[in-house]
Amino acid sequence: MNSWTKKWRRLFFCVAAVMMTVVLAGCGAGKSAGGDAAKGGATELKLAYHLPVDHHLSKSMEKFAKRVEEKSGGKLTVKTYPAGQLYTDKSMNDAIMSGGLDMGLNSTAMWTTVIPALNVLDVPFLLPNYDSVAKAIDGGLGKTLEAEFEKKGVKNLIWADYGYVQFANNKRPLTKPEDFVGLQLRGYGQIPAETIKALGASPVTMGSAEVYMAIQRGTIDGQTSGTTAMFARKIYEVAKYLTITNHAFCEFSLAMNKAKWDSLSPEQQKALSEAAKEIRDEIRKETKAEDEKTTEALKQAGMEVFTVPAADVAQWQAATMSVRENFIKDNGELGQKVVDECLKASK
């Protein structure tokens, strides 16, 4: 064997040895990374919601993402997708249940096709004030509904308050149930539509973005929604009368795919839970303040505001009792249970 052959052979073995070392090191590194992930290594979660970026709930989700990263020491991060960038409110829930989306903030009204018992929050005059809402959601009602979520492979991290539902119209002051007779009002779902009908008006189905023009053109006389939504959509420009009934409550759910939750380390789960609960408490205070602030803003913008006196609530309850009865009939024992939990919290 000549000297050139020997040199090439030595070079070949040196290169082969180096390549083998790199391969083994790579395998070792991959194994280590996998082990770290299983023990609570860096994980990114995707969080979607349809609300615009300037909405107070959207801002709360940004705070939530930041706190998760802080509390986990960077081992868990949350990437947010606001304003329907990733999923709309209609497609989001299926994505969460299938695992296509890790987390989503969505109205409980959008979950009612999956969990009909969530409609209880729209059953009129069950939860008269913010204290009763908090007591119900943090207590028996919340636990019962969270168990229903888990049956669908979903973990409800927190309930995020959106606010009370009121009535606005451009025809006349609504100071008693009889004043609703003959009006055409837009409702946002099954129970709100039943409530409108029980009060003697005709429910109309349409998207929230269509309401302003519909009132302006006379297609409808008014609508039911929260004052924050009324102010944001400038309903005060087309509707003169606002009736504060607090007859229903809009709640959002920060829901997570249960399998994804189970895949996290205990430390990551703790960071997620702690951040979520902190944000829940802040949202609760902000929502109550926003309700009061936007009600005053609507008044300043020219709307006549009538608040149903506590002494008159009983007659409004009586007028809409059929809605409660139908809800219980449609949902059986579970329906009766969640109604009872609301009534217990309101005492």
For the regions a protein language model found, what residue spans apply to each?
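Bacterial N-terminal signal peptides that target proteins for export
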Residues: 2-15
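N-terminal secretory/targeting leader peptides
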Residues: 2, 28-132, 141, 149-347
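C-terminal motif of bacterial Sec signal peptides marking the signal peptidase cleavage site
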Residues: 22-26
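Residue-level detector of intrinsically disordered terminal segments
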Residues: 18-19
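Short beta-strand-centered segments that line the small-molecule binding cleft or hinge
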Residues: 135
